[in-house]
Amino acid sequence: MSETRKLYYEDVYKKEFTAKVLECRECEKGFEIILDQSAFYPEGGGQPCDLGTLNGIAVLDVQEKDREIVHYTKEAVEAGSEVIGKIDWDRRFDLMQQHSGEHIVSGLVHEAYGYDNVGFHMRSDVITVDLSGVLTEAQLAEIEAETNQKIWENSEVEITYPSKEELEKLSYRSKKELTGQVRLVRFPGSDLCACCGTHVTHTGEIGAVKILTVENFHEGIRLTMICGKRVMDYLNMVNDQNRQVSVKLSAKIGETAVAVGRLQDENFRLKGQVAHVVDELCRAEADRWEGEGSVLLFHDGLEADQVRKMADAVMQKCSGCCAVFSSNGDGSYKYAMGELNGDLRQFTKEMNAALNGRGGGKPFFVQGSVKASEEEIRQFFRQ
């Protein structure tokens, strides 16, 4: 068994290469293709594998097994033949930006606060970083600002393979115990870490880093962040959304939050007025039907809690069952029914069956919805 020559370490920007097919083995995934050399990075170190093609055949997965790089395809390639490999470069460069950006963030956090990166995952939209301690929003803002400053300095990223003796004299980050040759990746002024992944050669290629969210995770926190082109994609999306909001609210781009605040205040005020009107309506209906027996009411435009409130108010004064229905505007109605000291369970079961409804509650008070017209509802109650 021979070791595959790793072209991605020799030239991380190699997008296309030629190689000899050493083996092509059938497997559950399709075929395992072993080459004498490869620019396809195999999954490892928290970084997804490269994708691309071999002679136009899609490479669906890449793993390293016993020093061999295994390319998984759905089609066979003849052993002994020569193939042209092509890397999905846009994807690879995106992953390089994410991985390199994460290193700088993790290194600066470790240097400033002593916290470790205890978990790292690259997704197609964001990356997550799990830290062993808690940082405030202000501290994270400082880390983000310093990270971007390091990026814009455009320092050369250094990759070395120190001897065992040299390693003993170095202070570097590592997520696990290391055996064999150690590959160190240095981001000047921010991080020195043992890593097998692919990285940019100059920090400026990362472009920018943006921390999107932070949440508590175990004893520390989980950061969700983006780097490189993803930052521009995110900025374009946020800017487009903000522009639409500014148009709808007739507000300047930089004043949408203030405009939304005014809208919220107005909405709160109007909700208070509506609640007052509904309370008055409930009292009026309760007075209207006092002592009148069972009552069936239809009032459009009510929310579920308002339907419940009206049914409860009328139930207290009528001498039977009160059922209140309010249209949802889509051919269905929300309802609430109540009867003091009554048991509506069987009636509700029959009504839901007849009117395509669902709902339930206590024996004397139920809520739910039905898919029926007003006339169909009235017809059922006339039975």
PLM region descriptions:
Residues 1-383:
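A glycine- and charged-residue-rich anion-binding loop/surface
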